[in-house]
Amino acid sequence: MYEGYRQIELLIGPFVEGELTNPDGTPKKGGSALSIISNGSVNTMRVQASISKSIFWVSNTANIIVWNLKKDTINRLRRPGQNVQVLAGYENGNMEVVFSGGIGYVKSERQGPDIITTIMCKTGGMDMLKSSMSISYTGGTSVKQIVTDLAQQIPGITVDPEKINIKGQIGYAGWSFVGSVSDALEKLQFQYGFTCNIDDGMFVVNMDDEAPSLSIVLDEKSGLKRVSPQLYGLFFFQTGWDIESEYVQGVRPGTSITVRSLYEREVKGGVHTMTYNLCPKTNQWDMNISMLNFFGSDYS
């Protein structure tokens, strides 16, 4: 089935992160955001997006470059409180959100006949550092309940309790904490074996000892380019795998993937960190993935 040109769409507006995204991650129709579209056709703009994402508690970042924007559009990007969503996919409408965050810095400069505008963005993960509270729970309370309550105190994100699948409960002595939400979550992560982050405006939790049940296959047919072991130290201790592939929809931090290479054995595990490098005009359509030796990875 022909899916049309590869395509990137930027949605820019003062909306809250995730506001233009449905619960399943697909973009909502309509809205007042400014739309900038780039694909292989001659009548769209050139856009390049370099995006870094992780399951660990760090902000996801995006470096977006747009060629020859109008001055009014550049001025809009520089207004306080502007956010951006990056959608990637194909012109037939099969698009997914690969980044949602706030605009931190905008720079425009002339390069020959072109005006190059660079937009530097970051997710709302750093909002957690500003969120402080005092909280206490009686013994026997589920860890899931505590994490859900903490996440709901973070401004500007969506929390779905059904997607917080954390096992265990606190001891009979109870649990109390005074300080920032980030410190509280870090303490719970270390004790109960999970990781959490904000991914495109959604609060996401992954257990360290199990990967999600649905696995996406990366092979030569889907655009797999390279898979190589991460080696460390004098005795070449393997710490994980590095994977390079064409961009495949649905792969994001926390996703379970199966890698089938003609030159390496089959590898299964969860995505820990990844980068997207997307530019439809130059046919750059790649992702680089790091899988570490935990989170359900199969290295046997």
Per-region residue spans from a language model:
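Short intrinsically disordered coil segments
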Residues: 26-27, 79-82, 118, 134-140, ...
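Extended Gly/Ser/Thr-rich low-complexity repeat segments
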Residues: 74-85, 130-137, 255-259
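Assembly/oligomerization scaffold segments
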Residues: 1-120, 274, 282-284
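Short beta-strand segments
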Residues: 96-99, 133, 267-269
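Amphipathic, non-transmembrane alpha-helical segments in extracytoplasmic/periplasmic proteins
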Residues: 62-67, 80, 121, 134-158, ...
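An acidic/polar, Gly/Ser/Thr-rich interaction patch typically located in mid-to-C-terminal regions
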Residues: 49-77, 208-300
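Short beta-strand-centered interaction patches in the first periplasmic/extracellular domains
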Residues: 114-128, 158-232
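Short beta-strands and strand-coil junctions in structured, solvent-facing domains, enriched
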Residues: 71-74, 92-93, 109, 127, ...
